[in-house]
Amino acid sequence: MYPTLENIKQLAQKKEYRRIPLCRELYADRYTPVEVMRTLRKASRHCYLLESASQTEVWGRYSFLGYEPSMEITCTDGTLKIRRTDAQGKAEETVKQVTHPGDTLREIIREYKTPVMENMPPFTGGLVGYFSYDYIKYSEPKLKLEDKEQQDFRDMDLMLFDQVIVFDHFKQKVLLITGVMTDDLEASYEVAVKKLEEMAQLIRNGEHMEFEPLKLESEIRPKFPKEKYADMVEKAKHYIKEGDIFQVVLSNPMRAKATGSLFDTYRVLRATNPSPYMFYFSSDDIELAGASPETLAKLENGTLSTFPLAGTRPRGKTREEDKALEEGLLKDEKELAEHNMLVDLGRNDIGKISKIGTVKVEKYLCVERFSHVMHLGSTVTGIIRDDKDAVDAVDAILPAGTLSGAPKFRACQIIEELEQSKRGIYGGAIGYLDFAGNLDTCIAIRLVYKKNGEICIRSGAGIVADSVPEKEFQECCNKARAVVQAIEQAQEGLE
Protein backbone atom coordinates (compact mmCIF):
# COMPACT_ATOMS: atom_id res chain seq x y z
CA MET A 1 0.00 0.00 0.00
CA TYR A 2 1.43 3.41 -0.89
CA PRO A 3 2.18 6.18 -0.15
CA THR A 4 2.93 5.60 3.53
CA LEU A 5 1.09 7.50 6.23
CA GLU A 6 4.26 9.53 6.85
CA ASN A 7 4.52 10.49 3.17
CA ILE A 8 0.86 11.49 3.16
CA LYS A 9 1.47 13.70 6.21
CA GLN A 10 4.38 15.38 4.41
CA LEU A 11 2.19 16.14 1.39
CA ALA A 12 -0.58 17.42 3.65
CA GLN A 13 1.80 19.86 5.38
CA LYS A 14 1.95 21.91 2.19
CA LYS A 15 -1.69 22.93 2.83
CA GLU A 16 -2.21 22.78 -0.94
CA TYR A 17 -4.21 19.57 -1.22
CA ARG A 18 -7.49 18.40 0.28
CA ARG A 19 -7.10 14.77 -0.79
CA ILE A 20 -4.14 12.39 -1.21
CA PRO A 21 -4.59 9.18 -3.27
CA LEU A 22 -3.88 5.88 -1.49
CA CYS A 23 -3.20 2.80 -3.62
CA ARG A 24 -3.21 -0.96 -3.04
CA GLU A 25 -2.08 -3.49 -5.66
CA LEU A 26 -3.42 -6.91 -6.63
CA TYR A 27 -2.01 -9.25 -9.26
CA ALA A 28 -4.19 -9.05 -12.36
CA ASP A 29 -3.76 -12.59 -13.71
CA ARG A 30 -7.04 -13.76 -12.13
CA TYR A 31 -9.18 -10.87 -13.38
CA THR A 32 -10.26 -8.99 -16.49
CA PRO A 33 -11.92 -5.57 -16.83
CA VAL A 34 -15.05 -7.21 -18.26
CA GLU A 35 -15.29 -9.67 -15.38
CA VAL A 36 -14.79 -6.94 -12.77
CA MET A 37 -17.37 -4.76 -14.52
CA ARG A 38 -19.93 -7.52 -13.99
CA THR A 39 -19.18 -7.41 -10.27
CA LEU A 40 -19.35 -3.61 -10.06
CA ARG A 41 -22.65 -3.45 -11.94
CA LYS A 42 -24.13 -5.88 -9.41
CA ALA A 43 -22.92 -3.60 -6.60
CA SER A 44 -24.03 -0.32 -8.19
CA ARG A 45 -26.32 0.86 -10.98
CA HIS A 46 -23.95 3.80 -11.49
CA CYS A 47 -20.67 2.56 -12.94
CA TYR A 48 -18.26 3.04 -15.83
CA LEU A 49 -15.43 1.41 -17.76
CA LEU A 50 -12.91 3.48 -19.75
CA GLU A 51 -10.31 1.80 -21.98
CA SER A 52 -8.10 2.68 -24.94
CA ALA A 53 -6.15 1.29 -27.86
CA SER A 54 -3.89 3.08 -30.33
CA GLN A 55 -4.61 3.30 -34.05
CA THR A 56 -2.11 0.47 -34.51
CA GLU A 57 -4.49 -1.61 -32.37
CA VAL A 58 -1.97 -1.87 -29.53
CA TRP A 59 -3.92 -2.09 -26.28
CA GLY A 60 -3.59 0.95 -24.03
CA ARG A 61 -1.81 0.70 -20.70
CA TYR A 62 -4.78 1.37 -18.42
CA SER A 63 -8.42 0.38 -18.01
CA PHE A 64 -10.35 2.50 -15.49
CA LEU A 65 -13.46 1.31 -13.63
CA GLY A 66 -15.62 2.96 -11.01
CA TYR A 67 -18.78 2.31 -9.01
CA GLU A 68 -20.86 3.76 -6.16
CA PRO A 69 -20.30 7.48 -6.86
CA SER A 70 -20.60 9.64 -3.76
CA MET A 71 -22.11 12.44 -5.84
CA GLU A 72 -23.94 12.92 -9.14
CA ILE A 73 -24.14 16.36 -10.73
CA THR A 74 -26.63 16.88 -13.55
CA CYS A 75 -27.79 20.02 -15.33
CA THR A 76 -30.73 20.37 -17.72
CA ASP A 77 -31.80 23.76 -19.10
CA GLY A 78 -30.20 25.56 -16.17
CA THR A 79 -31.62 23.28 -13.46
CA LEU A 80 -28.61 21.93 -11.56
CA LYS A 81 -29.14 18.88 -9.35
CA ILE A 82 -26.58 17.46 -6.94
CA ARG A 83 -27.29 14.10 -5.37
CA ARG A 84 -24.93 13.21 -2.51
CA THR A 85 -24.79 9.66 -1.16
CA ASP A 86 -23.22 8.99 2.25
CA ALA A 87 -21.30 5.90 3.39
CA GLN A 88 -24.55 4.25 4.52
CA GLY A 89 -26.12 4.70 1.08
CA LYS A 90 -28.48 7.49 2.12
CA ALA A 91 -29.02 10.00 -0.71
CA GLU A 92 -29.82 13.69 -0.45
CA GLU A 93 -30.57 15.94 -3.43
CA THR A 94 -30.22 19.69 -3.78
CA VAL A 95 -31.62 21.68 -6.72
CA LYS A 96 -30.78 25.19 -7.89
CA GLN A 97 -31.03 27.33 -11.01
CA VAL A 98 -27.77 28.37 -12.69
CA THR A 99 -26.75 30.30 -15.77
CA HIS A 100 -23.69 28.03 -16.08
CA PRO A 101 -22.84 24.84 -14.12
CA GLY A 102 -19.10 25.50 -14.35
CA ASP A 103 -18.79 27.37 -11.05
CA THR A 104 -20.31 24.41 -9.19
CA LEU A 105 -17.92 21.99 -10.91
CA ARG A 106 -14.96 24.16 -9.92
CA GLU A 107 -16.11 24.23 -6.28
CA ILE A 108 -16.37 20.44 -6.19
CA ILE A 109 -12.96 19.91 -7.79
CA ARG A 110 -11.39 22.38 -5.33
CA GLU A 111 -13.03 20.51 -2.45
CA TYR A 112 -11.10 17.37 -3.49
CA LYS A 113 -7.90 18.96 -4.85
CA THR A 114 -5.36 16.17 -5.35
CA PRO A 115 -1.66 16.05 -6.33
CA VAL A 116 -0.45 14.23 -9.43
CA MET A 117 1.35 11.13 -8.10
CA GLU A 118 4.33 10.04 -10.21
CA ASN A 119 3.95 6.33 -9.40
CA MET A 120 0.20 6.22 -10.06
CA PRO A 121 -1.99 6.25 -13.20
CA PRO A 122 -3.07 9.60 -14.72
CA PHE A 123 -6.56 9.27 -13.19
CA THR A 124 -6.86 8.68 -9.44
CA GLY A 125 -10.35 10.06 -8.87
CA GLY A 126 -12.61 12.77 -10.21
CA LEU A 127 -15.77 13.47 -12.17
CA VAL A 128 -16.66 10.91 -14.86
CA GLY A 129 -19.53 11.15 -17.32
CA TYR A 130 -20.64 13.28 -20.24
CA PHE A 131 -21.36 16.78 -21.51
CA SER A 132 -24.04 16.70 -24.20
CA TYR A 133 -23.81 18.55 -27.52
CA ASP A 134 -26.42 20.95 -26.12
CA TYR A 135 -24.03 22.00 -23.32
CA ILE A 136 -22.93 24.72 -25.75
CA LYS A 137 -25.97 26.74 -24.57
CA TYR A 138 -24.03 27.69 -21.41
CA SER A 139 -21.03 29.17 -23.23
CA GLU A 140 -23.21 30.52 -26.07
CA PRO A 141 -26.49 31.57 -24.37
CA LYS A 142 -27.71 33.31 -27.54
CA LEU A 143 -27.93 29.90 -29.22
CA LYS A 144 -31.47 28.62 -28.76
CA LEU A 145 -31.73 24.81 -28.74
CA GLU A 146 -35.09 23.07 -28.34
CA ASP A 147 -36.01 19.49 -27.41
CA LYS A 148 -38.46 19.01 -30.27
CA GLU A 149 -38.82 15.26 -29.68
CA GLN A 150 -39.13 15.55 -25.88
CA GLN A 151 -36.38 13.00 -25.16
CA ASP A 152 -35.47 14.74 -21.89
CA PHE A 153 -31.69 14.68 -22.39
CA ARG A 154 -29.51 16.03 -19.63
CA ASP A 155 -27.05 18.70 -20.73
CA MET A 156 -24.48 17.21 -18.37
CA ASP A 157 -24.23 14.12 -16.19
CA LEU A 158 -21.06 13.78 -14.10
CA MET A 159 -20.47 11.42 -11.20
CA LEU A 160 -17.88 11.85 -8.48
CA PHE A 161 -15.82 8.69 -8.04
CA ASP A 162 -13.42 8.77 -5.10
CA GLN A 163 -12.67 5.06 -5.48
CA VAL A 164 -11.07 3.89 -8.73
CA ILE A 165 -10.10 0.43 -9.97
CA VAL A 166 -7.30 0.52 -12.53
CA PHE A 167 -5.95 -2.35 -14.63
CA ASP A 168 -2.29 -1.63 -15.39
CA HIS A 169 -1.81 -3.92 -18.39
CA PHE A 170 1.96 -3.28 -18.51
CA LYS A 171 2.60 -4.25 -14.89
CA GLN A 172 -0.18 -6.87 -14.88
CA LYS A 173 -1.55 -5.36 -11.69
CA VAL A 174 -4.96 -4.20 -10.52
CA LEU A 175 -4.58 -0.89 -8.69
CA LEU A 176 -7.21 -0.03 -6.10
CA ILE A 177 -7.24 3.71 -5.36
CA THR A 178 -9.19 5.83 -2.91
CA GLY A 179 -8.58 9.18 -1.22
CA VAL A 180 -7.32 10.27 2.19
CA MET A 181 -8.84 13.65 3.14
CA THR A 182 -6.29 15.93 4.79
CA ASP A 183 -8.60 17.82 7.17
CA ASP A 184 -8.85 14.79 9.53
CA LEU A 185 -5.90 12.88 8.20
CA GLU A 186 -5.32 9.93 10.51
CA ALA A 187 -9.00 9.04 10.83
CA SER A 188 -9.43 9.43 7.07
CA TYR A 189 -6.40 7.19 6.48
CA GLU A 190 -7.98 4.40 8.54
CA VAL A 191 -11.25 4.76 6.61
CA ALA A 192 -9.32 4.63 3.31
CA VAL A 193 -7.41 1.48 4.32
CA LYS A 194 -10.71 -0.17 5.21
CA LYS A 195 -12.26 0.93 1.92
CA LEU A 196 -9.36 -0.57 -0.06
CA GLU A 197 -9.87 -3.88 1.75
CA GLU A 198 -13.60 -3.77 0.90
CA MET A 199 -12.72 -3.11 -2.75
CA ALA A 200 -10.28 -6.04 -2.78
CA GLN A 201 -12.89 -8.35 -1.25
CA LEU A 202 -15.49 -7.21 -3.78
CA ILE A 203 -13.18 -8.02 -6.68
CA ARG A 204 -12.18 -11.39 -5.19
CA ASN A 205 -15.54 -12.59 -3.95
CA GLY A 206 -18.25 -10.24 -5.24
CA GLU A 207 -21.33 -11.61 -6.95
CA HIS A 208 -21.41 -11.20 -10.73
CA MET A 209 -24.23 -9.53 -12.61
CA GLU A 210 -25.38 -11.38 -15.70
CA PHE A 211 -26.28 -8.59 -18.09
CA GLU A 212 -29.59 -9.16 -19.85
CA PRO A 213 -28.85 -9.77 -23.56
CA LEU A 214 -29.80 -6.95 -25.89
CA LYS A 215 -32.91 -7.70 -27.92
CA LEU A 216 -34.15 -5.47 -30.71
CA GLU A 217 -37.92 -5.22 -30.90
CA SER A 218 -37.93 -3.28 -34.17
CA GLU A 219 -35.63 -2.75 -37.15
CA ILE A 220 -32.85 -0.15 -36.87
CA ARG A 221 -34.03 2.66 -39.13
CA PRO A 222 -32.55 6.07 -39.98
CA LYS A 223 -34.71 9.05 -39.12
CA PHE A 224 -33.93 10.61 -42.50
CA PRO A 225 -34.15 8.32 -45.57
CA LYS A 226 -31.75 9.06 -48.42
CA GLU A 227 -34.10 11.49 -50.19
CA LYS A 228 -34.83 13.53 -47.06
CA TYR A 229 -31.15 13.64 -46.07
CA ALA A 230 -30.27 14.76 -49.61
CA ASP A 231 -32.75 17.65 -49.22
CA MET A 232 -30.99 18.65 -45.99
CA VAL A 233 -27.63 18.60 -47.77
CA GLU A 234 -28.97 20.83 -50.54
CA LYS A 235 -30.30 23.32 -47.98
CA ALA A 236 -26.93 23.33 -46.24
CA LYS A 237 -25.16 23.91 -49.57
CA HIS A 238 -27.48 26.88 -50.15
CA TYR A 239 -26.32 28.40 -46.86
CA ILE A 240 -22.72 27.80 -47.93
CA LYS A 241 -23.36 29.48 -51.30
CA GLU A 242 -24.95 32.45 -49.52
CA GLY A 243 -21.83 32.84 -47.37
CA ASP A 244 -23.40 31.93 -44.01
CA ILE A 245 -20.97 29.07 -43.42
CA PHE A 246 -18.08 27.24 -45.02
CA GLN A 247 -19.00 23.80 -43.70
CA VAL A 248 -21.62 22.09 -41.52
CA VAL A 249 -21.98 18.56 -40.12
CA LEU A 250 -25.44 17.06 -40.61
CA SER A 251 -26.22 13.93 -38.63
CA ASN A 252 -28.76 11.15 -39.11
CA PRO A 253 -30.01 9.24 -36.04
CA MET A 254 -30.82 5.53 -36.39
CA ARG A 255 -33.22 4.12 -33.81
CA ALA A 256 -34.89 0.89 -32.72
CA LYS A 257 -36.98 -0.30 -29.78
CA ALA A 258 -34.91 -2.58 -27.55
CA THR A 259 -34.70 -4.37 -24.23
CA GLY A 260 -31.68 -5.64 -22.33
CA SER A 261 -28.19 -4.22 -21.82
CA LEU A 262 -25.57 -2.68 -24.09
CA PHE A 263 -22.68 -4.29 -22.23
CA ASP A 264 -22.21 -7.12 -24.73
CA THR A 265 -22.28 -4.50 -27.50
CA TYR A 266 -19.39 -2.81 -25.71
CA ARG A 267 -17.56 -6.14 -25.51
CA VAL A 268 -17.88 -6.57 -29.29
CA LEU A 269 -16.75 -2.99 -29.98
CA ARG A 270 -13.62 -3.31 -27.84
CA ALA A 271 -12.69 -6.48 -29.77
CA THR A 272 -13.65 -5.46 -33.31
CA ASN A 273 -13.15 -1.69 -33.28
CA PRO A 274 -10.28 -0.89 -30.87
CA SER A 275 -10.09 2.89 -30.52
CA PRO A 276 -8.31 5.55 -28.47
CA TYR A 277 -11.46 6.01 -26.37
CA MET A 278 -13.67 3.04 -25.48
CA PHE A 279 -16.35 3.47 -22.87
CA TYR A 280 -19.27 1.86 -21.10
CA PHE A 281 -21.39 4.04 -18.82
CA SER A 282 -24.47 3.17 -16.78
CA SER A 283 -26.75 5.44 -14.74
CA ASP A 284 -30.40 5.51 -13.71
CA ASP A 285 -31.15 7.64 -16.79
CA ILE A 286 -29.13 6.16 -19.63
CA GLU A 287 -26.77 3.39 -20.72
CA LEU A 288 -24.16 3.95 -23.39
CA ALA A 289 -21.37 2.07 -25.12
CA GLY A 290 -18.93 3.27 -27.71
CA ALA A 291 -15.48 3.41 -29.29
CA SER A 292 -14.56 6.95 -30.31
CA PRO A 293 -11.50 7.70 -32.44
CA GLU A 294 -11.33 11.41 -31.63
CA THR A 295 -10.21 13.49 -28.65
CA LEU A 296 -12.38 16.50 -27.89
CA ALA A 297 -10.08 18.10 -25.32
CA LYS A 298 -7.16 16.85 -23.27
CA LEU A 299 -5.64 19.07 -20.59
CA GLU A 300 -2.49 17.79 -18.92
CA ASN A 301 -0.29 19.97 -16.71
CA GLY A 302 -1.46 23.12 -18.45
CA THR A 303 -1.14 21.90 -22.06
CA LEU A 304 -4.45 21.71 -23.92
CA SER A 305 -4.74 19.47 -26.99
CA THR A 306 -7.39 18.65 -29.54
CA PHE A 307 -7.09 16.21 -32.44
CA PRO A 308 -9.43 17.06 -35.34
CA LEU A 309 -10.31 14.12 -37.59
CA ALA A 310 -11.92 15.16 -40.86
CA GLY A 311 -11.77 13.45 -44.22
CA THR A 312 -12.97 9.86 -44.47
CA ARG A 313 -12.57 6.74 -46.59
CA PRO A 314 -13.72 3.15 -45.92
CA ARG A 315 -10.98 0.60 -45.22
CA GLY A 316 -9.84 -1.51 -48.15
CA LYS A 317 -10.37 -5.27 -48.32
CA THR A 318 -6.69 -5.81 -49.22
CA ARG A 319 -3.48 -3.99 -48.32
CA GLU A 320 -3.23 -2.69 -51.87
CA GLU A 321 -6.81 -1.41 -51.90
CA ASP A 322 -6.28 0.19 -48.49
CA LYS A 323 -3.18 2.01 -49.76
CA ALA A 324 -5.02 3.19 -52.87
CA LEU A 325 -7.85 4.56 -50.74
CA GLU A 326 -5.30 6.40 -48.57
CA GLU A 327 -3.67 7.97 -51.63
CA GLY A 328 -7.07 9.01 -52.94
CA LEU A 329 -7.96 10.57 -49.60
CA LEU A 330 -4.74 12.61 -49.52
CA LYS A 331 -5.45 13.95 -53.03
CA ASP A 332 -9.14 14.71 -52.52
CA GLU A 333 -9.46 18.51 -52.61
CA LYS A 334 -12.89 18.46 -50.94
CA GLU A 335 -11.60 16.37 -48.02
CA LEU A 336 -8.41 18.46 -47.71
CA ALA A 337 -10.37 21.72 -47.70
CA GLU A 338 -12.73 20.39 -45.03
CA HIS A 339 -9.82 19.19 -42.90
CA ASN A 340 -7.94 22.49 -43.16
CA MET A 341 -11.05 24.44 -42.14
CA LEU A 342 -11.44 22.31 -39.05
CA VAL A 343 -7.76 22.52 -38.11
CA ASP A 344 -8.13 26.32 -38.25
CA LEU A 345 -11.26 26.10 -36.10
CA GLY A 346 -9.37 23.92 -33.59
CA ARG A 347 -6.62 26.56 -33.43
CA ASN A 348 -9.21 29.26 -32.84
CA ASP A 349 -10.94 27.24 -30.10
CA ILE A 350 -7.71 26.49 -28.23
CA GLY A 351 -6.55 30.07 -28.76
CA LYS A 352 -9.55 31.38 -26.79
CA ILE A 353 -7.96 30.31 -23.50
CA SER A 354 -4.27 29.86 -24.38
CA LYS A 355 -1.27 32.08 -23.79
CA ILE A 356 -0.34 34.20 -26.80
CA GLY A 357 2.12 32.48 -29.11
CA THR A 358 1.66 28.97 -27.69
CA VAL A 359 -0.95 27.58 -30.12
CA LYS A 360 0.58 25.29 -32.75
CA VAL A 361 -0.21 22.41 -35.08
CA GLU A 362 2.12 19.60 -34.01
CA LYS A 363 1.01 16.89 -36.44
CA TYR A 364 -0.68 17.63 -39.74
CA LEU A 365 -2.60 15.46 -42.22
CA CYS A 366 -1.76 12.07 -40.74
CA VAL A 367 -3.86 9.14 -41.97
CA GLU A 368 -5.43 7.41 -38.96
CA ARG A 369 -6.80 3.90 -39.55
CA PHE A 370 -9.67 2.25 -37.68
CA SER A 371 -11.57 -0.99 -38.19
CA HIS A 372 -14.04 0.25 -40.82
CA VAL A 373 -12.79 3.69 -41.89
CA MET A 374 -9.66 5.83 -42.18
CA HIS A 375 -9.49 9.55 -41.40
CA LEU A 376 -7.19 12.51 -41.91
CA GLY A 377 -5.96 13.68 -38.50
CA SER A 378 -4.00 16.61 -37.08
CA THR A 379 -2.95 17.67 -33.56
CA VAL A 380 -3.44 21.21 -32.22
CA THR A 381 -1.98 22.27 -28.85
CA GLY A 382 -1.72 25.35 -26.66
CA ILE A 383 -0.69 26.29 -23.11
CA ILE A 384 -3.70 27.62 -21.23
CA ARG A 385 -3.59 30.95 -19.41
CA ASP A 386 -3.10 30.94 -15.65
CA ASP A 387 -6.71 32.06 -15.05
CA LYS A 388 -8.21 29.20 -17.10
CA ASP A 389 -8.96 25.58 -16.20
CA ALA A 390 -10.52 22.32 -17.37
CA VAL A 391 -14.07 23.72 -17.26
CA ASP A 392 -12.96 26.59 -19.52
CA ALA A 393 -11.42 24.04 -21.89
CA VAL A 394 -14.78 22.31 -22.32
CA ASP A 395 -16.47 25.67 -22.93
CA ALA A 396 -13.85 26.66 -25.50
CA ILE A 397 -13.95 23.50 -27.61
CA LEU A 398 -17.39 21.85 -27.18
CA PRO A 399 -18.83 20.98 -29.62
CA ALA A 400 -15.85 20.20 -31.80
CA GLY A 401 -15.76 21.76 -35.22
CA THR A 402 -15.67 18.26 -36.68
CA LEU A 403 -19.19 17.73 -35.29
CA SER A 404 -20.61 21.22 -35.93
CA GLY A 405 -18.96 23.24 -38.69
CA ALA A 406 -17.40 26.60 -39.43
CA PRO A 407 -18.13 29.26 -38.33
CA LYS A 408 -19.29 27.22 -35.34
CA PHE A 409 -22.11 29.41 -33.99
CA ARG A 410 -23.92 29.77 -37.33
CA ALA A 411 -23.33 26.09 -38.14
CA CYS A 412 -25.03 25.13 -34.85
CA GLN A 413 -28.01 27.32 -35.75
CA ILE A 414 -28.35 25.57 -39.11
CA ILE A 415 -28.02 22.13 -37.48
CA GLU A 416 -30.85 23.09 -35.13
CA GLU A 417 -33.01 24.12 -38.10
CA LEU A 418 -32.34 21.13 -40.35
CA GLU A 419 -32.01 18.17 -37.94
CA GLN A 420 -35.18 18.99 -35.99
CA SER A 421 -34.17 16.97 -32.92
CA LYS A 422 -31.98 17.39 -29.87
CA ARG A 423 -28.61 15.70 -30.43
CA GLY A 424 -28.15 14.81 -26.78
CA ILE A 425 -24.93 12.91 -26.15
CA TYR A 426 -23.97 12.69 -29.85
CA GLY A 427 -21.34 15.31 -30.63
CA GLY A 428 -20.78 16.05 -26.95
CA ALA A 429 -17.94 14.84 -24.74
CA ILE A 430 -17.35 11.68 -22.68
CA GLY A 431 -14.51 11.27 -20.20
CA TYR A 432 -13.23 12.73 -16.95
CA LEU A 433 -12.18 15.86 -15.09
CA ASP A 434 -9.80 14.75 -12.36
CA PHE A 435 -9.12 16.22 -8.93
CA ALA A 436 -5.65 17.40 -10.06
CA GLY A 437 -7.24 19.78 -12.58
CA ASN A 438 -6.58 17.66 -15.67
CA LEU A 439 -9.12 16.65 -18.31
CA ASP A 440 -9.42 13.87 -20.87
CA THR A 441 -12.53 13.69 -23.05
CA CYS A 442 -13.41 12.20 -26.39
CA ILE A 443 -15.99 13.36 -28.89
CA ALA A 444 -19.18 11.37 -28.37
CA ILE A 445 -19.30 9.53 -31.70
CA ARG A 446 -19.28 5.86 -32.78
CA LEU A 447 -21.59 5.07 -29.88
CA VAL A 448 -25.00 3.69 -29.07
CA TYR A 449 -27.12 4.78 -26.16
CA LYS A 450 -30.23 3.25 -24.66
CA LYS A 451 -32.87 5.48 -23.10
CA ASN A 452 -36.60 5.09 -22.57
CA GLY A 453 -36.65 1.61 -24.14
CA GLU A 454 -34.98 2.73 -27.36
CA ILE A 455 -31.46 2.53 -28.73
CA CYS A 456 -29.98 5.26 -30.90
CA ILE A 457 -26.89 5.38 -33.11
CA ARG A 458 -26.12 8.73 -34.68
CA SER A 459 -23.51 9.63 -37.29
CA GLY A 460 -22.85 12.63 -39.49
CA ALA A 461 -21.10 13.92 -42.59
CA GLY A 462 -19.32 17.21 -43.22
CA ILE A 463 -21.13 19.22 -45.89
CA VAL A 464 -19.14 21.65 -48.05
CA ALA A 465 -19.86 23.54 -51.27
CA ASP A 466 -19.23 20.62 -53.63
CA SER A 467 -20.73 17.83 -51.50
CA VAL A 468 -22.65 15.09 -53.33
CA PRO A 469 -25.79 14.36 -51.24
CA GLU A 470 -25.87 10.61 -51.90
CA LYS A 471 -22.20 10.26 -50.92
CA GLU A 472 -22.78 12.16 -47.68
CA PHE A 473 -25.71 9.87 -46.82
CA GLN A 474 -23.45 6.87 -47.45
CA GLU A 475 -20.72 8.39 -45.25
CA CYS A 476 -23.19 8.48 -42.35
CA CYS A 477 -23.93 4.79 -42.96
CA ASN A 478 -20.20 3.93 -43.14
CA LYS A 479 -19.51 5.63 -39.82
CA ALA A 480 -22.42 3.85 -38.12
CA ARG A 481 -21.53 0.41 -39.51
CA ALA A 482 -19.12 -0.69 -36.77
CA VAL A 483 -21.68 0.05 -34.05
CA VAL A 484 -24.58 -1.53 -35.94
CA GLN A 485 -22.56 -4.69 -36.55
CA ALA A 486 -21.58 -4.81 -32.87
CA ILE A 487 -25.26 -4.63 -31.90
CA GLU A 488 -26.13 -7.41 -34.34
CA GLN A 489 -23.32 -9.62 -33.05
CA ALA A 490 -24.26 -8.95 -29.40
CA GLN A 491 -27.83 -10.01 -30.17
CA GLU A 492 -26.61 -13.37 -31.40
CA GLY A 493 -25.06 -14.03 -27.99
CA LEU A 494 -21.44 -14.03 -26.82
CA GLU A 495 -19.51 -16.90 -25.32
Per-region residue spans from a language model:
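Extended alpha-helical targeting/anchoring segments
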Residues: 1-495
